[in-house]
Amino acid sequence: MKQLSTMKNLLIAMLLWSVGACFVKPMPRQMAYDFSSIDREIQAWVDSGYYDGAGLVIARENQIILDTCYGNYTPETQVYIASAGKWLAAATIAAVVDEGNLSWDDPVNQWLPEFTDVKGTATLRQLLSHTSGYPDYQPEGAHRDDYQTLKESVLHIVNLPADTMPGAKFHNGGLAMQVAGRMAELAAGKDWESLFQEKIAQPLGMVDTHFTPVDSGGGHSPMLGGGARSTLYDYTAFLNMIFNKGTFEGKRILSEKATEEMQADQVKQAAVAKHEYVERVRAEMHNGIYGLGEWREELDFAGNAVLISSPGWAGAYPWIDKTTNTYGFFITHVNVEKANQAGFSSFYSSPVLPMLVREVYQTENKE
């Protein structure tokens, strides 16, 4: 049964504290928007059986303006979020870079000398922007990368042949991020889950968000690129921090420079194939489609990202829209069988949400 409410400011703050996620204190003024168009869209997905349930939070300028759940979902529902975890992974590594223990331009072989081929010359920023030249996943017939440690994962990546020279081509995948995570582990002297908890999860109150244990059932590996699981409020706290340029509840989590680097064009001159994600969901082609762990869906005239996201194949979709000063998180997990039968793509459907928010915002401002 659908649960729908646009919460008043005090109630929202109390609820978020109760589940362990803390937001910047909401602005005192009340904001009322008609989100019925979004409600109808998501409810139709659930009614069609594509999702058993879903949750959605939308915030504007640090104030929650929509908080709703559908089907059997509650704010505490924890699911694997697939590639939505890439944003979390990049932020964790950014925290290690902030400490000076690692550089975005460090080559792989500086930390992992066993990479003696061209893969060893790829830089940390190339690993996190899918321009390293690494294969996207393990080859057909090989063991899927559902290893429980990055050390073990890297052992099975080192001997794979490179697809291209570093910097030559954008190729979205997961293996390169495993190597990036291992570099961060070595630089910080800690395992990945401990790093994530210390640098990102605990400071943000993300008590139900983890990268381990890695799912061995299929569809949610490798660890950094697809293995995170989270909840509605946990991930929204992360978005609040990114929206506020690295600060959360008055605490500095990431440097402002780190958030800028993550959002900057990291594809540069690498070739981008036609019909890549951004072109498909926004019907426009530009080369600067990716930063570090996040998509740059829309750019302004100066080339700055104004709509950033990290969509997961199963439907989870976090975004920040600078044109409306809003951010949101849609959490769900697709029923693969029913979606495939209907030709429904969870990956390409969720990105309609920020567009619907814009329509609502523009309509309200005209009245």
Show which residues each predicted segment covers.
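Bacterial Sec-dependent N-terminal signal peptides
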Residues: 1-29
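Sec-dependent signal peptide cleavage junction
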Residues: 22-42
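Active-site SXXK
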Residues: 42, 56, 62, 79-105, ...
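A short, well-structured edge-of-sheet supersecondary motif
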Residues: 43-74, 104, 205-207, 294, ...
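Active-site helix/loop module of the DD-peptidase/beta-lactamase fold
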Residues: 75, 80-84, 96-135, 139, ...
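Active-site Gly/Thr loop motif
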Residues: 207-226, 230-233, 264-327
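Short, gly/Ser/Thr-rich active-site loops of penicillin-recognizing serine hydrolases
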Residues: 273-275, 299, 337-367
